[in-house]
Amino acid sequence: MTDFLSSVTRKLTCKTFLIERMITMEEHTVDLLRECDSGCAMAAESLEQIRDFVSDQGLWNEITASYEKHQDLDLRIKKTLRAMEEQGKEPGKMASAWSWMSTEMRMMAKGGAKEAASIVTDGCNMGIKTICGYKNQYSGASKAAMELADELTGMEENLRNHMKKFL
């Protein structure tokens, strides 16, 4: 009888562990996707804003192409969240306001392609640091969510590299 109870207890403990792990994975997946959603939206807002100041056609094209890629990725992230019956996350109001204000001030003070590229580079670096931090925080997220986060950081790294010729 004791062996039987020990066996049942082990099986229940194992099942409980697996259920808890699945719940944690789903929570981490949703949280990571929400942060990626917010990051994509923040990047797109910033790129759209800075684009209005840019007169250099090459820089404008780079920013526009990246804006469209961020929009496309954000749609895929939102679709994934909807499939999980979850909502996305908007960028924080204070972060958005600060980003908008600092961009406006920097572009009014200095302006030009060099300053625009510098602002975009700073934004890319912030995005990379932020999303990598969330990947570490939500390390239990699904492989698909991690891949979307990697795609976002890859886009930021690519855009940052394309900005070098304008700095």
Residue ranges: model-predicted function:
Residues 6-25:
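Short, Lys/Arg-enriched N-terminal segments with co-localized hydrophobic residues
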Residues 75, 79-128:
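Carboxylate-rich helix-loop segments that flank metal/cofactor sites and access channels
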Residues 25-54, 115-139:
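Alpha-helical bundle segments that constitute or directly flank the non-heme di-iron/ferroxidase center
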